[in-house]
Each structure stands twice: as structure tokens, then as C-alpha cells.
From Swiss-Prot:
Family: Belongs to the CbiD family.
Enzyme superclass (EC): transferase
EC annotation from Swiss-Prot or TrEMBL: 2.1.1.195
Highest taxon above the source species: Bacteria
GO BP, sorted A to Z: anaerobic cobalamin biosynthetic process; methylation
Gene3D superfamilies attached to this UniProt entry: CbiD-like
Name of this chain's protein: Cobalt-precorrin-5B C(1)-methyltransferase
Keyword S-adenosyl-L-methionine carried by entry: yes
Record gene name: cbiD
Lineage: Bacteria, Pseudomonadati, Thermodesulfobacteriota, Desulfobulbia, Desulfobulbales
């Protein structure tokens, strides 16, 4: 039987690239009175890409495009990104002067409220590379003889609603989404995007003067840790599966103490010193986990059950049924030892169950 064909995951465009495209389109509309159906803009790597645009009725020189994030599960995929070009307008709290234009954050674009990010507090949450892309795209449309400074306002009508599905509130970005991107391209399920978010969370925590960082594998694990820890919201970062990176990053940024909260499958992977805990990067080897538990003192009858288990949760159930809290503790100690070796900091381990309860602390 032939194997089923699996097409490669499709890349898409960042909100920053979309914002640059509609900014150029709005500038053309303002200058010529004609709305372009398509524009081509430069990307940071020197390549050029085309975007389909639509004029927005009754809003002046305003153009829009629908963000296509490809096969990446991006919350902004399918969102309408708008830009309005004008010569008028007073400076407001969400505007910033660039070299050639004045850039403003409109409805649905967040505003930075905390230190530690690449954008200063009070400015629109439009990151440095998107700002450069917007200015470069607009420059291609501006007349060389035009001396007045152009105002570009970026808006995302669904931005406030979409922001609730992001970590923006924790980063100190209020009232909307961020306009993001470093290359203009969205890579499906991008590791670099995950890591950048983790690092940004840690930067915000350090800028707030925090000495302790809580890294968790997901929202359930984070909720469990919050039951024991009296720390501000900025101290928490969901690292997903990027365990080794998060430990190294927390160590590099100088936190004195790291709290690692995870469910059993993730904790036992840490005990096995698996640096990236997603199932596609080394599915939990039941045999390896069972071998570790055997080494730690599981008896013959228990080992039979452990080696026959299909999942990590099933293994934990066997340990609980047999009253082997000592083995659970030993696994957490191994995970702690690994985490402290990687981070070179003091690490506390919190084993969380599916009800967001802490069932062991080390």
C-alpha cells in the first residue's frame, strides 16, 4: 500500500507585512484617488511579495487586506487589517514619529503599558520590523516632491476580541493585538515565535524587578502553580514544549529562582532529560520511563504494569494505585536535578494533575 501524500505546511504573512501592504495601498489612494487592487512591497530579506487589497467604504483613504497565516494556527488568521492615510491629525497617545511618516495605532491595535519590550510604554504595539516595513512600503508610493508628513493609522476591527486569546495582557499590551513579525513570513507552528514570546515574558518580568520566574507547560499547569505561589502575573510564562530553551533563557536573564510546573508526562520527560517535550520530538518512550522507575525501585509486579502502559497518565495511575509516592517524588527530584543543571539556578518542581491541583512539590 502506498503511503498517503502529505503536502508541506503552507507559510503565510505576518500582521506586520499585511499592515505594510495596506499602508502602501492607502497612500496610493490618498495621492491618486484610485484604489489599487494589488500592491507589491519589499520584505526585510530583499524579496518582494504581492497582496490583494480592498477599499473600505466611507472611511477616507482606507485600504484593507485579509491576513493569511498559511497553515499556522494564528489567532489573527483571517482578520481584516486596515490602514488609513491622511495629512491631518493631532498627535495622540498611540502615535509615534518615524523618519518619513507618523504612525498611529487605531482601533484594535494594542498599546504598550509596561517596560521590557522592544517598544516603549505609551506607543502603539507595532513592533520594530513592521514599523520599518510600513515606512519602506509607504516610501515607494510617496512622491519625492511631497514635503508634508504622512499619517498612517493601522487598525484591526476584531483586535480587541482577538487579543483576549493571546498573552498580550501579561506582556502589558492593552486594548488590542500587536502588529508583529521579524521577516514578514509566518512559518507554520513556528518555534522561533514561541521562543520569542517566552523571552519577551521574561524580559517584562525582569523589567518589573522580579527575581523569580514561573514556567509552565500550559494553562492547567500554570493555574496549579498559582495556588501555591504569591507572585504577580508578570512572573508567569507558558513555555509549551520548549523546556531546555526556557530553562537556559531564565538562567541567562538572571532570575534567582525558577518554578517549573507541569503534568506527569512533561515532568517525567524532564527526568529523562528530554530537552523538547512535544510528542513529535520524541514521543514518551514508555519503556524508557518504565526503566527509570525500575531503577528508582519499582518492584517486579509494578514494572509489568508500567511496561504495559500506553500513556504517561496510565503509568501514574499504577503508581498511585500501589501507593508509590516515593517513586513520584524520585521522578520529580530527577526533573529538578536536570532543570538546575540546565539553568544553573535553584529550581522548584510542581507536579500538576488534570484538575489543576498540585499533587507533588519538590
Amino acid at each position: 500500500m502506498s503511503k498517503a501524500y502529505k503536502r508541506p505546511l503552507r507559510s503565510g504573512y505576518t500582521t506586520g507585512a499585511c499592515a505594510a501592504a495596506v499602508a502602501k495601498g492607502a497612500t496610493i489612494l490618498l495621492l491618486s484617488g484610485e484604489a489599487p487592487e494589488k500592491v507589491e512591497i519589499p520584505f526585510p530579506d530583499g524579496s518582494r511579495h504581492s497582496f490583494c487589497l480592498s477599499q473600505q467604504d466611507g472611511t477616507g483613504a482606507c485600504m484593507g487586506t485579509i491576513k493569511d497565516a498559511g497553515d499556522d494556527p494564528d489567532v489573527t488568521n483571517g482578520a481584516l487589517i486596515l490602514a488609513t492615510a491622511s495629512w491631518e491629525g493631532e498627535d495622540g497617545p498611540t502615535c509615534v514619529h518615524l523618519t518619513e511618516i507618523r504612525l498611529c495605532g487605531g482601533d484594535g491595535v494594542g498599546q504598550v503599558s509596561k517596560r521590557g519590550l522592544s517598544i516603549a510604554p505609551g506607543e502603539p504595539a507595532i513592533n520594530p520590523v513592521p514599523r520599518q516595513m510600513i515606512e519602506a512600503a509607504v516610501a515607494e508610493a510617496l512622491s519625492q516632491h511631497e514635503k508634508r508628513k504622512l499619517t498612517i493609522t493601522i487598525s484591526v476591527p476584531q483586535g480587541l476580541e482577538l487579543a483576549e486569546k493571546t498573552l498580550n495582557h501579561r506582556l502589558g499590551i492593552v486594548n488590542g493585538i500587536s502588529i508583529l513579525g521579524t521577516t514578514g513570513i509566518v512559518r507554520p507552528i513556528s518555534a522561533s515565535a514561541w521562543k520569542a514570546t517566552i523571552s519577551a515574558c521574561m524580559d517584562v518580568a525582569r523589567s518589573a524587578g522580579l527575581e523569580q520566574m514561573v514556567i509552565s507547560t500550559g494553562r492547567t499547569s500554570e493555574k496549579g502553580a498559582q495556588q501555591l505561589l504569591d507572585l504577580p502575573e508578570e512572573a508567569y510564562a507558558m513555555m509549551g514544549d520548549y523546556l531546555q530553551f526556557s530553562l537556559e533563557e531564565a538562567g541567562r536573564k538572571g532570575f534567582s529562582t525558577i518554578h517549573y510546573a507541569g503534568m506527569w508526562a512533561k515532568i517525567i520527560k524532564a527526568a529523562l532529560e528530554v530537552p523538547q517535550t512535544h510528542v513529535r520530538n520524541g514521543a514518551l518512550e514508555v519503556e524508557a520511563a518504565a526503566q527509570l522507575l525500575k531503577k528508582l525501585g519499582a518492584d517486579e509486579e509494578l514494572c509489568k504494569k508500567l511496561f504495559a502502559a500506553n500513556t504517561a497518565r496510565e503509568m501514574l495511575s499504577h503508581l498511585e494505585d500501589e501507593g508509590r509516592d516515593d517513586l513520584v517524588k524520585a521522578v520529580c527530584q530527577y526533573a529538578k536535578k536536570y532543570a538546575e543543571k540546565i539553568s544553573e539556578k535553584t529550581v522548584h518542581i510542581y507536579l500538576i494533575n488534570h484538575r489543576a491541583e498540585v499533587i507533588h512539590y519538590e
